[in-house]
Amino acid sequence: MQTISAYILAYNEAEKVKAATESVLWADEIVVVDSGSTDGTGEIAAALGARVVQVPFNGFGDLRNRAIEACNCDWIFSLDADERCTAAVRDEILGLLAGMPTFDAYQVPRRSFMMGRWIRGSGWYPNFRQPQLFRKGSMRYTLEPVHEGYELLTGKPLGTLRNAIWQFPFRDLEELMRKADRYSSLGAVKLAGKRVSMASAFGHGCWAFLKHYIFKRGFIDGWAGFVIAFGNFEGTFYRYAKRYEQAQDWSPPPVEPLRREEKP
């Protein structure tokens, strides 16, 4: 049977990396790609048998390409720290590798869990990202600062697994806000060279809310769907607002040193 490496990206994910690693203990090799965590993430993964590789963060595309280089098996299964493989996906993958897989790369459905429920709307199911199961050498990632793309290096089309993994994107609303801030900063880099205004930032934010809440049917998930849509408004608004800020000269006025005036 062909061998498989599972790689996990993690940065200060001490609360999540244990469960993620335990969900792929069936793999022939587990590689955790860490970017200088200070909360014990690497130590937790290593204690479970993972090989921890330190890679400086130069964008997610570069990070994932470095992860591929670190894997030694025939096939690679990509997992993020907030994702969990399921028994059904494990069995489906091992069944594929026991035979002759039809495709060289497969996308994997994800069921995302937030605010106590599986999110079915908001574009969150099947919520495919880049192919998560692929033969080593069959693809590489592109180098966008955020939401990195991929390039297939095979003549075969992309396959799809039948079963879904779990994703737990936000531990709580505080983490949602923190991630929105981080990703809006990375997204602002992608807008370099584009003319934006605060009005366009607001317009893009409103469209992001409507797209997720109405057109992607976020409303079917109650308040969780509203929070997701509002979070997309915030992330999109601040992405454009930060780009606008970068293009302005908003230096504060000079302040002269103030000393006590001498009395005559």
Write out the residue ranges for each language-model feature:
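Cell-envelope/extracellular polymer assembly enzymes that use nucleotide-activated donors
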Residues: 3-5
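Short, well-formed alpha-helical segments that are part of the catalytic scaffolds
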Residues: 7-29
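Acidic helix N-cap motif at the loop->helix transition within catalytic regions
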Residues: 18, 39-48, 88-89
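A conserved acidic beta->alpha catalytic loop
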Residues: 23, 34-44, 80
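Short, structured coil segments at secondary-structure junctions
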Residues: 26, 47-49, 129, 154
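Conserved donor nucleotide-binding strand/loop of the catalytic core
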Residues: 42-70
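Catalytic-site signature of metal-activated, phosphate-bearing donor transferases
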Residues: 62-68, 86-250, 257, 263-264
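Short aromatic/hydrophobic "clamp" motif used to bind/position activated sugar donors
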Residues: 76
